Regions:
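Short, small/polar-rich loop/turn modules that mediate ligand/substrate recognition or access, typified
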Residues: 141, 180, 185, 239-241
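C-terminal substrate-recognition "lid" of short-chain dehydrogenase/reductases
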Residues: 217-246, 251-252
């Protein structure tokens, strides 16, 4: 049986969007399992807060500002991880953006919000993978895990965000096929509703959608972090190009989620 406390000993890991929520939970889980983690986020104080909390636990973590929409910033983050840890073995793409929709009609969506959401949520993953791939291949145990959403699998509203998350599924499959010969595995985790800062002050909404989940609860960031850690580890050594849905059974039934929300304009992820 694998010792879960040491699955990533000696591994260098870079996590984007790690200043809060799912990204922070992923950084924490990898560090707890032995990884040396570069916590990156656009919000410098939040990234440093997460890294400092990990260091206080005796874990290895550094923080760096990274804007995944900027190639130079992404390149600098990858270089920092390699310089700090000696190798880059794990890349976890958590950074994303979801613009509020202008209205319930598809034709109301402005070009600007579409371009912004896709450039960060999909384009950002592309930039990070491009920068990291040579180092992941050199490590001999490289793994990429990106955070998708059930929005990319079924109709949960929010056109731009859903399109970007669906694109991640296709990117994951094509990149997995092209990276396998280099020894790099590429997978995707698709969460349902997870209790993050995006839902702060929206307890009524959470209560409304909770009953849509067969397992009877909303997901926690740690639920997603556990799935990411599995896919990034050697326990998943024969898994690549797949989407692991972590949604409390939502997509198995899809029981009226959109009608439970505000006009169906908000997705679960």
């Amino acid at each position: 049986m694998t010792d879960l406390t040491h699955r990533f000993t000696g591994h260098g890991a870079l996590v984007t969007g790690a200043g809060r929520g799912i990204g922070a939970a992923v950084a924490r889980r990898l560090a707890q399992e032995g990884a040396q983690v570069l916590v990156t986020d656009q919000d410098a104080p939040e990234a440093e807060r997460i890294a400092a909390a990990l260091r206080q636990l005796g874990l290895t973590a550094e923080a760096l500002v990274c804007d995944v929409a900027d190639r130079a910033s992404v390149d600098a983050a990858v270089a920092r991880a390699v310089d700090a840890f000696g190798s880059l073995d794990v890349l976890v793409n958590c950074a994303a953006h979801c613009s509020p929709e202008a209205g319930p009609k598809f034709e109301d969506d402005p070009d600007e919000s579409w371009a912004h959401d896709l450039d960060i949520t999909l384009g950002g993953v592309r930039r990070c993978c491009q920068a990291a791939l040579p180092h992941l291949a050199a490590s001999g145990r490289g793994a990429i895990v990106s955070i998708g959403s059930v929005n990319g699998l079924m109709d949960f509203g929010n056109h731009a965000y859903s399109a970007a998350k669906a694109g991640l599924g296709s990117l994951t499959r094509t990149l997995a096929g092209r990276s396998a010969a280099r020894g790099v595995r590429v997978n995707l985790v698709a969460p349902g509703t997870v209790r993050t800062s995006a839902w702060e002050g929206r307890d009524d909404d959470l209560d409304a959608v909770r009953d849509c989940y067969p397992l009877g609860r909303i997901g926690e960031p740690e639920d997603i972090a556990a799935a990411v850690a599995f896919l990034a580890s050697r326990d998943a050594a024969w898994i690549t190009g797949t989407t692991l849905v972590v949604d409390g059974g939502l997509t198995s039934v899809h029981t009226g989620f959109r009608t439970a929300m505000d006009g169906g304009r908000t997705g679960p992820g």
